[in-house]
């Protein structure tokens, strides 16, 4: 469900991702991004899907990693998400570049039909399955059905882009309820050589929200900034001007307070390879 800007969720990934793997630059354009997912095992949580997140190369100079053979930043999603989201992309429902004429007077069924009119015969569900090269009884098709894309219900948004229509439809399904609890997961995997031996260090963090208002997302986004501002006001940060938090005098006290006061904790596992 949504715990941050819904529009950003719908438009996420709409730029070529770039990273380095085995010493080579890799580029993944938007139309392939969710198809080229990787499986990642999260410490104590099991498998998740990961797709490359924009420009991983930005972090090389910031962290002094200009000569490493592998660097990739990814977004984690539950297993099955990437295939379903790729279906929305292939249909064309994440396009934010053009308004659909008379969109306020057509149904979701009619909208989807306009995308697959060239496919002959069968129900709308069967023709969408042809477009996606999926069985009509596949899980992805069930997910599109659950979302409400086959309903003969009016969209009721005039001159809306496909992305806006999708966003509003997702808001119906993905709005946090008061009793809901979100979950944030972050994991770093670092391979390095020390003393002639190769190691893998995994540092993993999981945080659950309290309810639909006090979310894990709001804590992990808001608390670091709040702690930093307090440190500045207390005169404990000497840096001046616009800074990013990669200095020890910033990240050490912030991480320490996050762990001690708010249970934002990274667990680590070290393995000899």
Regions inferred by a protein language model and the residue ranges of each:
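C-terminal catalytic/substrate-binding lobe primarily of soluble NAD(P)-dependent oxidoreductases
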Residues: 1-273
């Amino acid at each position: 469900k949504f715990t941050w800007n819904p529009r950003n969720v719908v438009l996420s990934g709409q730029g070529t991702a770039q990273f380095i793997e085995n010493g080579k630059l890799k580029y993944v354009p938007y139309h392939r991004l969710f198809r080229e997912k990787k499986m990642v095992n999260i410490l104590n949580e099991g498998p998740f899907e990961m797709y490359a997140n924009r420009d991983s190369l930005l972090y090389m100079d910031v962290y002094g990693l200009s000569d490493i053979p592998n660097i990739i930043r990814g977004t984690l999603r539950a297993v099955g998400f990437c295939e379903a989201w790729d279906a929305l992309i292939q249909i064309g429902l994440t396009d934010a570049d053009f308004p659909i004429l008379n969109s306020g007077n057509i149904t979701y069924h009619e909208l989807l039909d306009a995308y697959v009119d060239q496919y002959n015969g069968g129900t709308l569900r069967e023709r969408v399955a042809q477009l996606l090269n999926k069985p009509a009884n596949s899980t992805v098709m069930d997910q599109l059905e659950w979302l409400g894309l086959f309903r003969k219900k009016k969209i009721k948004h005039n001159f809306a882009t496909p992305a806006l229509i999708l966003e509003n439809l997702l808001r119906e399904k993905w709005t946090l309820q008061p009793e809901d609890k979100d979950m944030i997961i972050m994991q770093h995997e670092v391979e390095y050589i020390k003393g002639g031996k190769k190691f893998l260090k995994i540092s993993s963090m999981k945080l659950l929200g309290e309810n639909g208002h006090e979310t894990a997302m709001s804590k992990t986004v808001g608390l670091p900034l709040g702690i930093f501002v307090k440190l500045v006001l207390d005169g404990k940060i000497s840096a001046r001007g616009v800074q990013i938090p990669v200095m020890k005098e910033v990240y050490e006290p912030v991480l320490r307070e996050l762990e001690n006061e708010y249970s934002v904790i990274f667990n680590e596992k070290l393995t000899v390879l």
